[in-house]
């Protein structure tokens, strides 16, 4: 530890006047471990804490802001300050937060007031987190102050839910007993947020509201003795009884909403779906306290009111997701079968196979709203399935094939067509299909090769390929350009047409600027789906070629855009090389050219296959044969010499006779190795017979062509090279040796004179 450092008292004196970079330098200096010293605790560090408390209690908002940040830094990096003065600093910050909350409307009117609220809340949260799990500090400094901090945070959560709800959620999870007196107050605040302001909240804040509502069920409900049944007293009480009560209450509120959809679609046409709807859980009258949502007000004369159906289902799905996905201090019982049945019912609410009610008034506005809300109702089932599969994995393995079959209902088809996908509707459901592909990827990772190729996979491939293209917003404008021009000529409004031309000039001159490009997260999900499909199935030729085209073109575009090919596309190219399917042409050369700057071991091995070196050098390892081995070597050498001498003696006469008739004969030099000859006389006899037959068949030709004939000219004279070898193949049958010799090598035809033939007969 360095002995020379800035005194804490010096830093404390400069805190009041420090601004900007000077204040940042002081905070960075206080993080040094040299100040963690008991000798400094009573004098220097106590003086620093006094200055910090002075800043926090100051009426100046900037001094308050500096005091909050300084207290957080010193408590986080100096355990001595946290242990001795942490409770004092927390109480000071909380008191200022309580004061500011009383004047919330006036404080929040300025921009720095919003930032000050954010700083106060985050400072309280950080110091609480620093004190947790420290027994003495938590018992003596934190818990007594939480009873005063929690009411203020609950009040403030009505105005700043995004800032306060994470803090309350951690307190509710860790200090459940301390939070118990304030449960009803917090429940009221959450219900007001759900009923009145839920649709106007952001996605993150909506999730926080639902999670806090679920964590309220960690507290056990004290049931009065009058309502208890003495006959049920012997039953086991589970730790998650209150949690399960809340879960089942939310789950049972889906059925009335789905029954309202029965006024739009005729459920009686599908008996299985009708029975499944009846089997859904119903709200128990004894648990009416859990039902706090108001009833829906729908009017078919005002079709836009039908949008309340998917909005209510989305709210219930968010709350159910919180109950089945949040971590709890005890194991919980989740009705996976009931949730799966609910999702099947939601996916079945579709006009794909169910007709509309005959009593409905069929007008364009009502039909348009119905066609829009039905996919959103189905999407809530897909969301629940995604959470169930991601959290519980193979626990729902028995449901996976049914899930894939139900997903097919979500893919829109054109009316009065033979399973032709309606890509116009698909384009408007891009966000929903991203969730579908995440769900399918998780399911296929558990199933894989157990599945045969099914229609839903082929349809999802078509959807993925369509959505992988960048969406051009002005395609419809160009398609209807002629009709627009005709309308303009009929109206003859010159001034409006000129202004319209000026407004539309960018559309016609720079159409590439009106394009919605896909994100990398979308490409990653699509590529994972394609990789799974290629690994597990042999796709038909058309979709397989389309996937190849997609991977190559998008890789080139992204390489030009980012300077490199993303990892998901590298994995897709590797998968396409390893699984070519029924295609005969491999994309290996294209993939290598795209990934030439990437040292990929797989592509390197495919281009330059190598035998493991460790297996090669052992093949030629010399063996120590000893004296017996040397004797065997001598015997083998002698046998080879005798075989060579006998073979030379047998072929000597024929070679001399062939040398006398070399005037018009070209002697071949064989291109391959000389075959192993067993009996030369048999070959000469066979060759002479073949030569006679060939002369008779080719008498009309001027030249006789012999197979593998070459002229060997070595200076002044011709030299015939004849190599004969005798090996172990003498033991093979004569017929096999003749066939092999005929295929590998042919002896040139040699014409003998009549005198020489007579001499042979006399001999």
UniProtKB/Swiss-Prot annotation:
Acidic residues bias: start-end ranges: 736-763
Main location per the UniProt record: nucleus
Organism superkingdom: Eukaryota
One Pfam family recorded for the sequence: RIX1
GO BP annotations listed: pre-replicative complex assembly involved in nuclear cell cycle DNA replication; regulation of DNA-templated DNA replication initiation; ribosomal large subunit assembly; rRNA processing
Compartments reported by the entry: Nucleus
Region of interest called Disordered, as start-end residue ranges on this chain: 722-763
Region span, Interaction with MDN1: 663-763
Subunit structure: Component of the RIX1 complex, composed of IPI1, RIX1/IPI2 and IPI3 in a 1:2:2 stoichiometry. The complex interacts (via RIX1) with MDN1 (via its hexameric AAA ATPase ring) and the pre-60S ribosome particles. Interacts with NUG1. Interacts with IPI3.
Function comment: Component of the RIX1 complex required for processing of ITS2 sequences from 35S pre-rRNA and the nucleoplasmic transit of the pre-60S ribosomal subunits. Regulates pre-60S association of the critical remodeling factor MDN1.
Name of the protein described by the UniProt record: Pre-rRNA-processing protein RIX1
Species of provenance: Saccharomyces cerevisiae (strain ATCC 204508 / S288c) (Baker's yeast)
């Amino acid at each position: 530890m360095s002995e020379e450092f800035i005194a804490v008292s010096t830093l404390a004196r400069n805190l009041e006047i420090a601004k900007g970079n000077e204040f940042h330098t002081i905070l960075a200096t206080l993080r040094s471990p040299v100040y963690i010293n008991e000798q400094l605790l009573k004098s220097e560090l106590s003086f620093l804490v006094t200055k910090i408390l002075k800043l926090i209690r100051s009426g100046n908002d900037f001094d308050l802001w500096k005091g909050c940040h300084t207290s957080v830094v010193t408590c986080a990096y100096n355990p001595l300050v946290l242990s001795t003065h942490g409770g004092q600093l927390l109480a000071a910050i909380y008191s200022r937060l309580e004061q500011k909350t009383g004047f919330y409307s006036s404080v929040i009117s300025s921009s720095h007031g919003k930032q000050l609220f954010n700083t106060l809340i985050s400072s309280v949260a950080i110091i609480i987190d620093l004190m947790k799990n420290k027994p003495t500090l938590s018992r003596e400094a934190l818990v007594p102050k939480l009873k005063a901090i929690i009411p203020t945070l609950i009040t403030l959560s009505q105005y700043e839910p995004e800032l306060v709800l994470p803090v309350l959620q951690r307190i509710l999870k860790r200090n459940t007993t301390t939070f118990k007196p304030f449960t009803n107050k917090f429940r009221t605040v959450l219900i007001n947020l759900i009923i009145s302001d839920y649709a106007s909240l952001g996605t993150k804040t909506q999730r926080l509201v639902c999670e806090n509502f679920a964590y309220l069920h960690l507290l056990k409900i004290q049931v009065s003795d009058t309502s208890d049944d003495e006959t049920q007293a012997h039953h086991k009480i589970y730790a998650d009884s209150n949690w399960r009560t809340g879960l089942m209450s939310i789950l049972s509120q889906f059925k009335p909403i789905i029954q309202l959809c029965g006024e739009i679609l005729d459920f009686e046409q599908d008996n299985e779906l009708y029975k499944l709807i009846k089997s859904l859980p119903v709200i128990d009258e004894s648990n009416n306290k859990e039902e706090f949502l108001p009833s829906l007000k729908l009017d078919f004369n005002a079709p836009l009111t039908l949008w309340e159906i998917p909005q209510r289902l989305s709210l219930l799905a968010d709350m159910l997701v919180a109950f089945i996905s949040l971590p709890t201090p005890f194991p919980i019982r989740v009705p996976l079968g009931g949730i799966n049945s609910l999702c099947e019912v939601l996916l079945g609410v579709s006009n794909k196979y169910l007709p509309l009610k005959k009593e409905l008034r069929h007008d364009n506005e009502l039909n348009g709203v119905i066609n829009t809300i039905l996919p959103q109702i189905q999407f809530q089932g897909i969301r629940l399935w995604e959470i169930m599969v991601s959290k519980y994995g193979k626990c729902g393995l028995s449901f996976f094939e049914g899930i894939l079959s139900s997903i097919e209902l979500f893919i829109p088809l054109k009316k009065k067509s033979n399973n032709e996908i309606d890509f116009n509707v698909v384009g408007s459901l891009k966000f929903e299909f991203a969730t579908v592909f995440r769900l399918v990827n998780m399911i296929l990772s558990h199933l894989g090769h157990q599945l045969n190729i099914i229609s839903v996979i082929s349809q999802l491939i078509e959807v993925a390929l369509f959505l992988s293209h960048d969406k051009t917003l002005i395609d419809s404008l160009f398609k209807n350009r002629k009709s627009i021009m005709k309308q303009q000529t009929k109206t003859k409004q010159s001034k409006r047409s000129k202004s319209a031309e000026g407004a539309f000039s960018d559309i016609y001159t720079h159409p590439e600027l009106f394009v919605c490009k896909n994100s990398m997260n979308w490409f990653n999900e699509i590529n994972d789906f394609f990789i799974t499909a290629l690994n597990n199935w042999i796709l038909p030729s058309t979709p397989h070629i389309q996937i190849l085209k997609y991977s190559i073109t998008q890789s080139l575009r992204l390489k030009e855009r980012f300077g490199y090919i993303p990892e998901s596309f590298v994995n897709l190219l590797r998968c396409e090389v390893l699984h070519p399917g029924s295609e005969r042409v491999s994309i290996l050369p294209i993939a290598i050219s795209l990934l030439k700057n990437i040292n990929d071991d797989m592509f390197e091995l495919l281009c330059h296959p190598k035998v493991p070196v460790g297996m090669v050098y052992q093949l030629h390892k010399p063996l120590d044969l000893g004296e017996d081995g040397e004797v065997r070597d001598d015997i083998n050498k002698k046998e080879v010499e005798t075989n060579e001498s006998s073979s030379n003696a047998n072929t000597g006469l024929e070679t001399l006779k062939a040398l006398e008739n070399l005037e018009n004969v070209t002697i071949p030099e064989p291109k391959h190795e000389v075959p192993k000859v067993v009996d030369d006389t048999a070959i000469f006899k066979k060759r002479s017979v073949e030569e006679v037959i060939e002369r008779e068949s080719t008498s009309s030709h001027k030249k006789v062509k012999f197979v593998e004939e070459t002229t060997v000219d070595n200076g002044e004279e011709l030299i015939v090279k004849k190599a004969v070898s005798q090996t172990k193949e003498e033991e093979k049958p004569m017929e096999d040796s003749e066939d092999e010799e005929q295929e590998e090598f042919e002896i040139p035809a040699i014409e003998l004179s009549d005198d020489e033939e007579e001499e042979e007969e006399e001999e």
